[in-house]
Design a protein with these regions (language model features):
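Conserved SAM/SAH-binding beta-strand->alpha-helix loop
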Residues: 71
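Conserved beta-strand/loop positions that form the S-adenosyl-L-methionine
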Residues: 45, 68
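Conserved beta-strand signature within the Rossmann-like core of class I S-adenosyl-L-methionine
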Residues: 146-153
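Conserved glycine-rich SAM-binding loop
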Residues: 48
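Class I S-adenosyl-L-methionine
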Residues: 160, 164-230
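A short glycine-rich, Lys/Arg-flanked "PGG" loop and its adjoining helix->strand segment in the class I
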Residues: 131-145
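S-adenosyl-L-methionine
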Residues: 1-43, 51-58, 80-106
């Protein structure tokens, strides 16, 4: 479902400037130098309205959570939420996940959260999924040895496709612990009694420079899904 355009977007973002990183590319390789008070940096791809973001940051005060959300109308709501709730160990970036290598050097991020991403239902769109092999290769380069991706979705075909994609790319899979923070979507789906599919994937042990070319990794087969009504 598309968000409605937020009125006064620019002034609202300016009021939350302390939470907004406008040029993350300038901090590539320098994040720990810029934020020395935090023991680790974690990344969230697609923060939506920030419910998960703020709760996860509160639970881990010695961690800086960097939330990437390409839809500025959603991101401003998340920033306002962080400001209102006094959550200081989170920063937001209105960028596309495809640009992650421009923003972070290898090994800078200890963990990546992907919560309820766009399933990109059409066959021609599968490579745009955040769990497609091309993205997984990017994550492997960004994460240190033992680094993980925590993935949640309500879309079973996407989940099954993602599990196969992780496996093809050499990631080790394990169940996600219970009691992780919820997104707004997750809370709504849980209230309705709908299933949520979760998995934790640990990056391959192969050094990033020895990763196979992404063109050598097959894209998992999947049936095209029908679009949901908005």
């Amino acid at each position: 479902m598309r968000m409605r355009h937020k009125p006064n977007l620019i002034p609202r973002m300016e009021r939350c400037a302390d939470w907004h990183v406008k040029e993350p590319e300038a901090l590539r390789g320098k994040w720990r130098e810029a934020f020395p008070e935090y023991k680790e940096l974690r990344l969230e791809l697609g923060c939506g309205k920030g419910r998960f973001t703020c709760e996860q940051a509160r639970r881990c005060p010695d961690m800086l959570l960097l939330a990437v959300e390409k839809v500025a109308d959603a991101m401003v709501v998340a920033m306002e939420r962080a400001e209102a709730e006094g959550v200081g160990n989170v920063r937001f970036m209105d960028k596309d996940a495809a640009l992650l290598p421009d923003m972070f050097a290898p090994g800078e991020i200890s963990r990546i959260y992907i919560n309820f991403p766009d399933p990109w239902r059409k066959t021609r769109q599968y490579k745009r999924r955040l769990t497609a092999p091309e993205f997984l290769q990017k994550y492997t380069a960004l994460l240190p040895e033992g680094g993980q991706v925590w993935f949640k979705t309500d879309n079973r075909p996407l989940y099954e496709w993602s599990v196969e994609s992780f496996t093809l790319c050499g990631w080790k899979l394990e169940p996600m612990p219970e009691g992780t923070p919820m997104t707004d979507y997750e809370a709504k789906f849980t209230e309705q009694g709908l299933p949520i599919y979760r998995v934790v994937a640990t990056r391959p042990t192969v050094p990033p420079e020895k990763l196979p070319d992404v063109s050598e990794i097959p894209v998992p087969a999947a049936e095209e899904q029908e679009d949901e009504e908005e």
